[in-house]
Amino acid sequence: MIKQLQHALELQRNAWNNGHENYGASIDVEAEALEILRYFKHLNPAQTALAAELQEKDELKYAKPLASAARKAVRHFVVTLK
């Protein structure tokens, strides 16, 4: 799990080098994962566990939006989570 989210952080930092306003922090990636999970009506057990873990983190309210490539990487991670 950490490896896929690290990949999203690398994509975000590349976007920052190209002019995006957000450097990228782990809470940004976690907040994006939680936002994606909120769109699902039916979650598998792994997705349910991740959603519960992320909902407990109060610091996610300070997260900033990710670049599109990083959002796509997080979305791919969440959808393929088993």
Curated annotation (Swiss-Prot):
- Positions of disulphide bridges: none
Question: Which GO molecular function terms does the record list?
Answer: molecular function inhibitor activity; molecular sequestering activity
Instruction: Spell out the InterPro entries in the cross-references.
Output: Linr3
Tell me which HAMAP family the record gives. Answer: Linr3_BPT4
Family per similarity comment: Belongs to the T4likevirus lysis inhibition accessory protein rIII family.
Q: What does this protein do?
A: Probably binds to the cytoplasmic part of the holin during lysis inhibition and stabilizes the holin-antiholin complex thereby resulting in a robust block of the hole formation.
Subunit description: Homooligomer. Interacts with holin (via N-terminus).
Q: What is this protein called?
A: Lysis inhibition accessory protein
The gene that this protein is the product of is rIII
